[in-house]
Amino acid sequence: MSKLVISTSIFQSQVADLLPCNNHQKSQLTYSLINAYDLLQHFDEVLTFPYARKDDLLEFHSKSYIDYLINGRFNKMMAQDVNNPMVESKWSELSELADNWNEKIDYNPSQDLQRFTTRENLYNYYLNHSQALENNMDCINNSEVPTNDKPTDTYILNSETKQYNLEGDCPIFSYLPMYCQVITGATLNLLDHLSPTERLIGINWDGGRHHAFKQRASGFCYINDVVLLIQRLRKAKLNKITYVDFDLHHGDGVEKAFQYSKQIQTISVHLYEPGFFPGTGSLSDSRKDKNVVNIPLKHGCDDNYLELIASKIVNPLIERHEPEALIIECGGDGLLGDRFNEWQLTIRGLSRIIINIMKSYPRAHIFLLGGGGYNDLLMSRFYTYLTWCVTKQFSNLRCGDNNSFQIDPFDVCDGDDSEQFIREHDLVEMYNEENYQYWIYEMEGSSRMKMLRNDNKDRDMVELMKFYEL
């Protein structure tokens, strides 16, 4: 039996969508769709207000970096947002859409299901419902800008922004400290339910920030929650841990943190081509006598090829390590329909691979984290379907005679995907241009399904197997 725990809520999703690359919507779309399919009722615990203290972040990151990153002067509206009212309007767009839906169906959501219409309201809720002020005064109020001052970027135009790479794809954005502490907490708080007598399966689709380094941000990642999770697991006396990364990009931050550890195995399956971020993760970077495993793939990888990679290389290497805990980074930027347009995995295919790995290690604690994915509507479908797969396979609450679980929403008769539409819910109109079809990116004949040339060959797999002595 497994205990299923997920960290998700309207609050968490709106905080997650402060991240610029989330386009004010990625996490909220996912949360709403998971709710539309009634999946949260299958979990033993749903964490709704995650939080990580400053000391938690310091278990991996340097003090100078954390002191700067979560300083209270950034827990406010930055000047670039104050001077651009369109940004706030865009941020509140989903709230307005949800309100219109609720009014249409005459539904009055409870307070915990109401969205925050401004980021300032979101932050006030954060202050009122956390112990941040009490336990972490230094990171909330240190160098706080007086409230009657106009927001200004003067504070951030200095050498430290360059030193910590807080520019380019990792800019300082409004309420950055709140974002870092909530989203990191969403991963770490899963461990509150760790027990030596029961297998834990924990999920945080807003986590998996695998590019962040000890002293700098990188690739949209500010705090490396994966590394912090592994450190916590080690403190809990779980010594042998495996990290598997299916993101399109190499999991460089996690790999570097544990590159000399004999107890921590890192496996990254990623695109490796000249000029592709982050430029690391070649086969030569791996160390056969250590636990650094890189599986560099080429353009066009599909379900069949990745399933072979998983069965012939990934699983045997995990078995060799015999982990007590397994962390899987479930990035979706390799899916058909993602803006990178590099791989052609399907939602069903990638989910099947992940579930098969989970089933192969019934005694290991398992943590599923999010990752890349730059088609927000596609990602909401992926994480909703994968969540359903996890509950279908592992939820204790689905066992026995429970009438509420009689119908599985993704069981399609005769394989006819064309008749399966997104369920009605508060954000369903976001899927209007895709005709509300759930599988539009995988349907034969769909204008959204664009097949790619697969440059990965059987000989490449043979080379990988030979390198890892399989």
From Swiss-Prot:
Domain of life: Eukaryota
Enzyme class, UniProt record, top EC level: hydrolase
Protein's cellular compartments: Nucleus
GO MF annotations in UniProt: histone deacetylase activity; histone deacetylase activity, hydrolytic mechanism; protein lysine deacetylase activity
InterPro entries hit by this protein: HDAC_PDAC, His_deacetylse, His_deacetylse_dom, His_deacetylse_dom_sf, Ureohydrolase_dom_sf
GO cellular component terms listed in the entry, alphabetical order: histone deacetylase complex
Pfam families for the chain: Hist_deacetyl (PF00850)
SUPFAM superfamilies: Arginase/deacetylase
A Gene Ontology BP annotation from the UniProt entry: positive regulation of transcription by RNA polymerase II
Span list, region Histone deacetylase: 47-392
Similarity comment: Belongs to the histone deacetylase family. HD type 1 subfamily.
Role: Responsible for the deacetylation of lysine residues on the N-terminal part of the core histones (H2A, H2B, H3 and H4). Histone deacetylation plays an important role in transcriptional regulation, cell cycle progression and developmental events. Histone deacetylases act via the formation of large multiprotein complexes.
Designated name of the protein: Histone deacetylase HOS1
Lineage: Eukaryota, Fungi, Dikarya, Ascomycota, Saccharomycotina
